[in-house]
Every structure is written in C-alpha cells, then in structure tokens.
Amino acid sequence: MRILLNTLYVTTPEAYLSKDGLNVVISVKGDEVFRIPIHNIEQIVTFGYMGASPGLMKLCADSGVALTFLSPHGRYVGRLQGPTRGNVLLRKAQYKYAEDVDYSLHLSKLFIAAKIQNYRNILRRFVRDNGENSDVVLAAEELQKCKNRTFKATSVDSIRGIEGDAASTYFGVFAQLMLNQRDTFVFTGRNRRPPKDAVNAMLSFVYTLICNDMAAALETVGLDPYVGFMHTLRPGRASLALDMMEELRAYLGDRLVLSLINRKQITIKDFLQQGDEGVVMTDTGKKIILSAWQNRKKEQIVHPYLNEKVSIGLLPYIQSMLLARYIRRDIDDYPVFLIK
C-alpha cells in the first residue's frame, strides 16, 4: 500500500477493501494489514480481482473518493465515481487544451525533449559502465543537439521530425549496447508492422505493454487516453497514451530488452519467422518478457519530482496524475520523468 498525490495504491492482488466507520480497511486473507481515514485520500486504485465491499463503495461515492479497479497486471477494469463533476471538468479542460496550438506545442516539446534526454542517459550510462565507445559518445552528442532543436521548434510537425532524427541516431548505435548474443540478435535499425527481426519484435511488444499501462493510468485519473496533444486523433488510437509513454520508452522498454539479451534470459530460439507477419515471439518468449516486465515493475526507485520511493510500475499513474494536475492548473508545469 502506498499513498502518492493523495491517492491510495493497493498493489497486493489478494487485497480486499472494506470499511470500518469512516476508515478504509485493507485485508489480505482475512487479516487487516492497513487502514486509513477516508477523508485523507482523494482516490483509491486497486490492482487485483478480490474487489471491495458494497459498504466501502457507498462510502467512497458519498465522500467523493474515486475507486478504480485494475487487473493485477494494470489493465483498466472499471471505475466507481460518486456524483461529482471533477472528471467532467478535467476532460473538458483536456479537450479545450488539445485544440490549443500553443498548449499542445509546449507539451509536445516536454514529451520529446524528455524522451531524447532519456535516450542520452542510456547511452551515457553504457559508456560509464563499459568504457569509451566513440560511436555511442558521438550519438549522445548528436542527441543533445536534437534536444536543443526541440525547444526551438515552432510547430508540432517539426517536433515530430526532430523526434525521427533522434530515434534514427539512437537506434543507429542500439546494437552496440548489446554485449552478448549480437551474432544472433541482429539489429540494423528500428522497423515495425511487422517487425523484421527479434529485437524489433521485443521492442514492439514491450512498447505495447507500456501503452496499455499508460492508457489504464490515464483512465484512472479521469483523463481521456484517446485525445492527445502531439499524436493526432485517429479512431481507436490512444493518442494521449502514446504522448505520455514517450518519456518512458527508453527507461521501461529499451532497458528491459537490453537486459534480457545481455543476461541471456531470452535467446533467438524464442522467436519464429512467419512470412508476412515478420518475426514473432513464441509463447515461451512472451512468458519470459511478461515475467521480466512484472518483476521490473516491482523494483523501487526514487521519483525525481516527488522525491519519494515508488515502485516502477506506478510511474504511468504518477505521471498521469501530474499531467491532470497541470491541466487543472494545480501546478505551474508538467514535470517529465527523467532517468539518471
């Protein structure tokens, strides 16, 4: 159980939520493990299928505390919200700002500058841990130039172009970050739909996991994941989730893929070539990645803005909450997530 930004996160899948007077009570296998007065929180987010008592649901509704249910893996299930206009007003503000060119440009700059900086930090960490590599050093320097260009951009379209240049530079040296199995995990650049090699298959799969978590997080805080500021509206596309995941791709996705390859936790035998479908993962390969993904989300870091220890799996929810606060004008700017 963690309380962040006035939100109670119940991350134990076996937890059952009930009430005792005006207190929220968390129990695991019949034993009480946590309680908190309802008036101390604004929202409860629970990961699991054990559920909550009708009494607690009524208490939350009467107290204006949103109760959000997610699967143990973070997929959005549903949300109980009492008679409040908070989410309506938040989404109304979101839709208004999504049509505001200057507002969208500002957020787009933040999303992509953070993405590029996190690219740089991965390259710099590689050099720090493994010694000088001229190609990687030059790529990091080029990424700094791309980041500088981002802040000078005058349109979202130009930011997309800079993003493309940065991705080309970063993935141009990505293969050099693979210390093992480089002869079998051949990578010559980013490709998708379908992925043409095992590395791209893994990247696409992990990015999908991040996008799903981000969409669930946005739903949880009351934002519409389908209306973004940089990615254009398209039926069925979670544009805001795609916007928000940009700053997390390198930290959550790329590092996981590199770790699995370098530690030989996954091998080329976990992939198949399937004609027009390109390279796909076997069921065993998917299980390996999903297991590593869930373990990774349990690890703890100090959040750079909150300066608190949090599990990595909560990052999409924290960033979504911070964006909601920025849209509500509770904070002066949106604090992006940057790794060291």
For each of these PLM feature ranges, what is it?
Residues 28-30, 48:
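Short, well-ordered turn and helix-capping elements at secondary-structure junctions
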Residues 1-19, 29, 35, 87-226, ...:
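Active-site helix-to-loop segments that bind/position phosphate- or nucleotide-bearing substrates
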Residues 52-54, 58-63, 67-109, 120:
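Phosphate- and other anionic-substrate recognition elements at nucleic-acid/protein interfaces
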Residues 42, 54, 58, 208:
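Short alpha-helical basic/polar micro-motif
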Residues 24-25:
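Hydrophobic residues embedded in beta-strands of well-ordered beta-sheets
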Residues 38-52:
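Extracellular/luminal Protease-associated
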Residues 45-49, 70, 206:
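Short His-Asn-centered micro-motif
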